[in-house]
């Protein structure tokens, strides 16, 4: 129900404050922090999906490189991904296209082929696992749901998202 409130009459994404006011009319007790994280995730996923469509149009003309916000708020596991460079058709992009967590500010950019050395394939697998693993007290991986690519999968919320369990 709340997802229908994300866009205004012109189809533009509403600022969080406006979105939150409207959600509160439907669900007065909804947690603002959770809703803000979900709103940001939906916006980032939609932007990543649109970006992926552009990447697909360009084909393998460019390599892709993972970049963080490069500040003190970047998670250590995401910081390890900084500069990861692989071809556009590398399977890693099906699992590591941002957003890779709640309030993730990372991004993937196209870079000129040959400008950067490729990150070793075996190292990439390990880095992807580390960036998307966060075990809870029962040993379940809470971050597994972030192993997706919104553009490839054509979804805003990944298949393991709790929304699908309602």
Report residues per predicted region.
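Domain-core detector
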Residues: 1-101, 109-166
């Amino acid at each position: 129900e709340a997802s229908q409130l994300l866009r205004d009459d012109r189809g533009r994404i509403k600022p969080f404050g406006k979105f939150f006011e409207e959600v509160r009319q439907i669900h007065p007790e909804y947690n603002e922090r959770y809703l803000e994280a979900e709103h940001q995730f939906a916006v980032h996923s939609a932007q990543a999906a649109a970006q992926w469509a552009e990447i697909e149009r360009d084909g393998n003309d460019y390599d892709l490189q993972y970049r963080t916000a490069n500040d003190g708020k970047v998670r250590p596991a995401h910081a390890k991904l900084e500069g990861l460079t692989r071809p556009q058709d590398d399977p890693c992009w099906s699992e590591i296209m941002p957003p890779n967590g709640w309030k993730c500010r990372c991004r993937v950019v196209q870079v000129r082929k040959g400008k950067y050395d490729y990150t070793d394939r075996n190292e990439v697998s390990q880095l992807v696992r580390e960036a998307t693993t966060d075990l809870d007290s029962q040993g379940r991986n809470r971050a597994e749901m972030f192993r997706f690519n919104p553009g490839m999968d054509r979804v805003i919320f990944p298949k393991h998202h709790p929304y699908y369990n309602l």
